[in-house]
Design a protein with these regions (language model features):
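Non-cytosolic beta-sheet module surface loops
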Residues: 32-36
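TerminUS-proximal long segments
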Residues: 62-129
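Short, small-residue-biased leader/transition segments that mark boundaries at the very start
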Residues: 1-5
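Contiguous beta-strand segments within globular domains
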Residues: 15-31
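Short loop/turn segments at connectors of secondary-structure elements within structured domains
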Residues: 24, 38-40
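Residue-level detector of short, conserved catalytic/binding motifs and their immediate flanks
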Residues: 28, 42, 78
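Extended low-complexity, serine/threonine- and proline-enriched intrinsically disordered segments
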Residues: 41-59, 66
Length: 129
């Protein structure tokens, strides 16, 4: 395998699919298609726009990853949830946000696979839930 596959890829955004700034008072979902091309693992971590530090919340949860016991859809896809309200029966896939606090995510691929580079797997936009 090429040395490039031993690296990490970081993807980020400050806006949702509609072009609106990510807002801690709004609930969002990110639908990860099946077979995320990460030979080691993938992770999603949220950060505070003002401090650029890991997002603070009462639950002390700032990330989710493929190394966790997430709820996986029948087709192998995973829905990640961000917002002040936990999604019913999918709390394992939720990263809480705080109203009044802007945030941004880093989605990381550790040992990214070929499907990322040839764009046969594409990370969708975050959408309002």
């Amino acid at each position: 395998a090429s040395d490039v596959y031993k690296r990490q890829i970081y993807m980020s955004t400050y806006k949702d699919k509609d072009g609106d700034w990510l807002d801690g008072g709004v609930n969002y979902v990110l639908h990860l298609p099946p077979d995320v091309p990460a030979e080691s693992f993938w992770s999603m971590t949220l950060y505070d726009v003002d401090t650029r530090c890991i997002i603070g919340n009462e639950q002390h949860i700032a990330d989710r990853s493929s190394r966790m016991d997430l709820v996986v859809n029948e087709d192998g896809s995973v829905d990640l949830y961000f917002g002040p309200d936990a999604p019913a029966s999918k709390e394992a896939n939720w990263i809480p946000t705080v109203a009044g606090k802007a945030w941004f995510p880093y989605f990381r691929l550790y040992s990214p696979g070929k499907a990322f580079f040839d764009k046969t797997w594409v990370l969708p936009d975050i959408e309002k839930a």
